[in-house]
């Protein structure tokens, strides 16, 4: 979906199921723009990362990051080979030594808003809205997305925001 969006002339279609990272207001259950902490919400409750089919939380974001810290080189999830390390490597700026920066502290979960601001160029909803005049016609009929209403990793929330945005853009006659 991201490749189709960023390179609409190069690809002739995308078929996406439970797409990751389409709107960073819901990066799973983290709003990277507003939240202060990735591990706990504004009420002090642990943020779930993965849920079972019945909705029961299997593990939290904090637990997942702690596990990735354990398997990562230098005790950092950035080197774990896991999803969280991968997203930081792709979306975030690099440090002077080439190491990917982390959007949040790997031990406390405190979000670094200066890094979050640099992720915005990879927020597909924001990018699509900003570039809709030229992008809309190029994407016509090319994005094929399927999403259930209860994704295990809470990806459906971001997709709902993306869908609402697309409906608004299309209703303004900018198809």
Predicted regions and their residues:
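Non-catalytic cap/lid and distal C-terminal segments of serine-dependent acyl enzymes
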Residues: 1-175
């Amino acid at each position: 979906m991201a490749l189709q969006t960023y390179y609409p002339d190069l690809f002739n279609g995308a078929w996406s199921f439970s797409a990751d990272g389409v709107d960073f207001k819901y990066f799973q259950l983290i709003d990277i723009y507003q939240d202060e902490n990735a591990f706990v919400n504004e009420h002090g409750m642990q943020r779930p990362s993965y849920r079972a089919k019945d909705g029961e939380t299997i593990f939290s974001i904090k637990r997942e990051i702690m596990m990735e810290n354990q398997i990562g080189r230098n005790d950092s999830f950035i080197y774990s080979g896991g999803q969280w390390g991968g997203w930081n490597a792709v979306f975030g700026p690099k440090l002077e030594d080439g190491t990917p920066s982390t959007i949040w502290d790997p031990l406390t979960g405190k979000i670094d808003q200066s890094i979050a601001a640099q992720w915005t160029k990879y927020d597909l909803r924001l990018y699509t809205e900003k570039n809709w005049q030229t992008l809309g016609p190029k994407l016509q009929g090319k994005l094929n997305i399927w999403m259930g209403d209860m994704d295990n990793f809470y990806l459906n929330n971001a997709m709902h925001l993306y869908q609402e945005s697309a409906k608004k853009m299309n209703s303004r006659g900018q198809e």
